[in-house]
Amino acid sequence: MPRYVIINADDFGLSCSINRGIMEAHRFGTVSSASLMVNTPGFQEAVSLAKSTPSLGVGLHFNLTYGTPATNPLLVPSLVGAGGSFHGNQAEWTCRDIARELYTQYGRMLKHGLRPTHVDSHQHIHLDNPVVYSLVKKLVQYEELPLRLPSNRPDPELPWVTDELFMYTYDSQIGVPHLLSLLCKIPEGITELLCHPGYVDDDVRRLSTMTTAREEELFVFIDPQVVVCIAELQAHGILQVIHYGQFQAIRSVLTRGR
């Protein structure tokens, strides 16, 4: 069976410096997909970049923990603190407010001319919170979109899920040798390789605890050894880099071939 990998950069739109790093990695032929935050400082720029770069698949990075909601804060009171920003306390969230914010964020992408290629979430809240998961699941089922799920948490009701999920960002062995090793170990089927490349600016320092690690990842993904390795694996038909917008067609072919 063929081997496919989606190299997905999270936090597209977090800041202009993150956008710059993701686009640089994409131009180098490594990052093929990105997950867009719609309520962060770099959103408008990210939309323009996405529209001018159709080779980059762009999904929704559902966010309930950073910044202010896409919805009027008065309409989602359980999600925000006194200042109108997300407080991140899941114990206070209500199903109604989560659903309202989810569909507002999804709708904001559509209103800006982008149909998400997939859905995932910031800080994996759809995996950690059962209510969030049930709401996101309903959305992707209705819209027929892929959803990020690890292989140890399969959902038979969701057909558009990768066979494997490699969370490169959370691996203690970040570096060129380790990434080269991972690329050579991509299994048959479709795998997502999750990463967080980007440059760091004041917005990133204000909004995220992940700072220098982003630049470290970026330098790995644009390293000549990595770029050449991916190009050679593709040239020899060993591995194909795709994005989530190509997922369903490839999955259908793979399913028919079984």
Range-by-range predicted roles:
Residues H61, H122-H124, H196:
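Histidine-centered divalent metal-coordination motifs
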Residues A9-F12:
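DG-centered beta-turn motif at the end of beta-strands
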Residues M1-I6, C16-G57, T65-H118, P130-R258:
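Terminal accessory/targeting
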